[in-house]
Curated annotation (Swiss-Prot):
A Pfam family assignment: PepX_N
Entry keyword Protease: yes
Keyword Protease annotated: yes
Species name: Lacticaseibacillus rhamnosus
Catalytic site: S370, D490, H521
Assembly, per entry: Homodimer.
Family according to the record: Belongs to the peptidase S15 family.
Gene3D superfamilies: 1.10.246.70, alpha/beta hydrolase, Galactose-binding domain-like
GO molecular function: aminopeptidase activity; dipeptidyl-peptidase activity; serine-type peptidase activity
Main subcellular location: cytoplasm
EC number(s) per entry: 3.4.14.11
Name of the protein in question: Xaa-Pro dipeptidyl-peptidase
Localization: Cytoplasm
């Protein structure tokens, strides 16, 4: 186990003493050592209310091999050995003597586990106070810091009752859980947008669900975590809407110019505002939906309000889904504008009684994963005032890069046949309200049919419709600071979405952080080896409470999880910056690779059918040295590596090839060869319900990325796809003459991949990808001129 810690601050001793006093702990370095130790350890068991109960707790803790804590305190000690202090500390952190660590050598265990310690015996009261401060900021076996663990056991449960005016509490630069999340005020409002996405001539009203600390009723203004969550009110069955992968790849007769595929700015109709009949501070509707996002819940107990809005076309709101369209962005922005006092909301949909976000400080962060993070990115690219930061986990930065790739229809990994219209059906939760749907059904079906036409599964081309869903082109508008989190094995929302957005905001005068993990399409707030919650606490305390805690400097610019050594995270100044710490190598496919042939015929669809394969089994088979697809691919290998290398950036291919058809699909996979127990891409549960989000509040599982129990012969590093008629970009088209050689350029998905010595790089070139592209039945023959083809790889030095 490694409990990496990137968010711990080390203030000077005077500041430490002030903070200890602030939370009610001993803080006088002149006080007797024994009295300070007794008071400190008593405070470390907040669940024990009486001295007798405290003595029982002390007796359960070993100080060394011959003395428990009760016995040690009874001696009225004047000092404490370093080993004794950390024997006690480890038990307080949730570790077990005799099974997790040896009482004769706690420091060795702490070093391996990456836990901090003081370097000497505690000879004076000041030493004890300093060591105790460090302990409070140290992570427990249960992922959170020791002070968080104390709070979960009731340390702060009466904190607000002791003051006339509720307030946030800071310790080690982070806001603490001094608010009772169980008493959160739950309410619903309807925000009037400028959007008319269902074309009924009225401004769409957007429902927003609010959870705010009860302390706001006593005058406390709080910042807001806002999650634009299209799934908030449920989803629909999409079986009937899901596309069967097409069997014919259309020949494109012509392309388009850059101007033709550039979306014009969306025009907003001039619609009358609803009349206001009165104003109130009291909501008229209770929030019956529970908060679904543990990350937000964690901050609710720390004095942040949490707001969810599903947006246009969802249950209890107006409008239609537009899947990444400007209407969805505008809907999210409308919520922020209400939270910052610049837009109107109502207590219900009909009587015109207005309500303000009077409890909001006007400082907002957008949070969430996947579609939720996508809308955070979209919101940031508007430059809306009051949005201070986004924490976007696996978000889409261009919808074309989600459903298309280089002129091809390419499904998100694991969702073959999905497209924008399918997701529209999935998230159109207004369908769940029969009374709403009876008057909408025809208009919705017409809207959906138009979306199906606009998305254009025939050509897969980049069009103005997709351009309107490309947030990166508006990246220059971003004013909010940005945290991006993405899985290096996320083939659903592929890494390009994060890295291209990271590059797009690189030169902006904002703070930005990038976290890359070894998972698929998953959250990381509950990954044990990373102090993500503490990192984001430090970040949001700075961003939303205005605390000068050096979050920008303390948190790494880029943090990457290693794919070889478990529970290892490395900090870097940037990602794939060719000007720093990188070297690029270009390999010729003929002279620098070995290959048995330079041609293949793509029988993948027939083989897929004959083998009764699934998308998952195909993805495994296509990168396996000996599989049923051996004749439907080129298999090129480099020599075995003599030393470790770290691939980081965007691999690039320049290919010269010929096909016997006027069009074709080309798929490429870069593969790590060599038997090894590689990481599972889904994190394993290591503590069921082990992460507590507040005192007597919700819990969630603690997870960790672990090596598999069995060896595998290969592992996908990255991949890419291209329509051979789109060798330059996704909108210009070239005519292919069958049998005649032509040139294609292709970027693979960005990656960071540690290749150990003894492994081999393999490049697999094939045709249709049964898991992601359409599935043509026509057999196409491919011949490559390997001598005129290259692979460029960026490596971290």
């Amino acid at each position: 186990m490694k409990l990496n810690q990137f968010a711990r601050l080390t203030p000077d001793i005077d500041q430490q003493l002030k903070e200890l006093a602030r939370i009610g702990l001993p803080a006088d370095p002149q006080a007797p050592f024994a009295d300070t130790a007794a008071a400190m350890y008593a405070a470390f068991f907040p669940e024990a209310y009486q001295p007798a109960a405290q003595q029982d707790k002390f007796a359960q803790v070993a100080v060394n091999s011959h003395q428990n804590l009760a016995e040690w305190l009874a001696t009225k000690p004047t000092h404490m050995k370093r080993a004794d202090f950390y024997n006690v500390a480890l038990q307080l952190l949730g570790f077990e003597a005799f099974s997790d660590f040896d009482l004769s050598d706690p420091i060795s265990f702490m070093t391996v586990t990456k836990l901090p310690s003081v370097a000497h015996d505690l000879l004076h009261t000041a030493d004890l106070l300093q060591a105790s401060y460090l302990l409070l900021t140290t992570r427990t076996k249960h992922l959170v810091s020791f002070l968080d663990d104390l709070a979960n056991r009731g340390f702060f449960k009466d904190f607000q009752a002791q003051s006339s005016q509720p307030a946030h509490l800071l310790f080690n630069g982070k806001v603490q859980q001094v608010f009772d999340a169980r008493q959160a005020v739950r309410e619903v409002v309807w925000i009037e947008s400028d959007v008319d996405s269902d074309h009924d001539g009225q401004r769409d009203l957007l429902e927003a669900t609010i959870y705010r600390p009860k302390a706001t009723d006593r005058g406390l203004k709080v910042p807001v975590l806002f999650t634009a969550n299209p799934y908030f009110h449920g989803t629909n069955d999409v079986t009937a809407a899901t596309h069967v992968p097409e069997t014919v790849l259309a020949v494109k007769p012509h392309g388009a110019s850059k101007a033709e595929v550039t979306a014009a700015p969306a025009s907003k109709p001039k619609l009358p505002a609803r009349p206001v009949t009165g104003e109130t501070k009291q909501a008229a509707a209770y929030a019956e939906e529970n908060s679904p996002y543990a990350f937000n819940d964690y901050f609710l107990a720390r004095g942040f309000a949490v707001v969810y809005s599903a947006g246009v076309g969802t249950r209890y709101s107006d409008g239609f889904r537009t899947i990444g369209g400007p209407e969805e962005t505008d809907g999210a922005v409308a919520v922020i504008e209400w939270l910052t006092g610049k837009r109107r909301a109502f207590t219900n949909r009909t009587d015109g009684v207005a309500i303000k976000a009077w409890w909001s400080s006007g400082k907002v962060a957008m949070t969430g994963k996947s579609y939720l993070a996508t809308l955070a990115i979209a919101g940031a690219t508007t430059g809306v005032e009051g949005l201070k930061t986004i924490v976007a986990d696996a978000g889409i930065s261009s919808w074309y890069d989600y459903y298309r790739e280089n002129g091809l229809v390419v499904a998100p990994g694991g969702y073959q046949g999905e497209d924008a219209d399918v997701l529209a059906v999935d998230t159109f939760s207004r369908q769940k309200s029969g009374g709403d749907m009876i008057r909408l059904k025809k208009a919705w079906e017409q809207h959906l049919a138009q979306m199906t036409r606009d998305q254009d599964r025939t050509t897969g081309a980049y069009t103005a419709w997709w351009d309107a869903r490309n947030y990166r082109k508006n990246a220059a508008n971003v004013k909010a600071d940005v945290v991006l989190i993405h899985g290096l094995n996320d083939w659903n929302v592929k890494p390009k979405n994060a890295i291209r957005f990271w590059q797009a905001i690189a030169d902006l005068p904002i703070q930005k952080k990038l976290i890359l993990h070894q998972g698929q399409h998953v959250y990381v707030h509950n990954v044990r080896s990373l102090d993500f919650l503490d990192m984001m606490n430090l970040w949001l305390t700075h961003e939303l409470l205005g605390v000068a805690n050096q979050a920008e400097q303390v948190l790494p610019n880029v943090l990457v999880q290693d794919n070889v050594t478990p529970q290892t995270w490395s900090a870097y100044s940037d990602f794939a910056n060719p000007a720093a710490e990188h070297v690029t190598t270009t390999a010729n496919l003929k002279t620098d690779f070995e290959s048995a042939t330079d041609q293949f015929s793509d029988h993948a669809t027939a083989t897929f059918t004959a083998q009764h394969d699934t998308s998952a089994s195909f993805e495994k088979a296509i990168i396996t040295p000996n599989s049923a697809y051996v004749n439907s691919r080129l298999w090129l290998t480099q020599p075995v590596l003599e030393h470790d290398r770290v691939l980081e950036g965007i691999p690039h291919l320049e290919l010269t090839l010929a096909v016997d058809a006027p069009t074709g699909i080309l798929s490429v996979r870069l593969v790590d060869l060599g038997k090894a127990k590689r990481f599972e891409e889904n994190a394993a549960t290591v503590g069921a319900s082990g992460l507590q989000l507040g005192f007597d509040f919700k819990t969630t599982d603690i997870v960790e990325f672990k090596p598999a129990n069995k060896e595998t012969p290969s592992k996908l590093i990255t991949l890419g796809h291209i329509n051979l008629q789109n060798p330059k970009n996704a909108y210009e088209v070239q005519t292919i003459t069958p049998g005649q050689f032509f040139h294609v350029s292709l970027d693979l998905q960005p990656t960071h991949y540690h290749l150990p010595a003894g492994r081999q790089l393999a490049l697999i070139i094939h045709g249709a990808d049964m898991a992601q592209t359409i599935r043509p039945t026509k057999v196409t023959h491919y011949q490559l001129d390997l001598a005129k083809s290259t692979l460029t790889l960026p490596f971290r030095i």
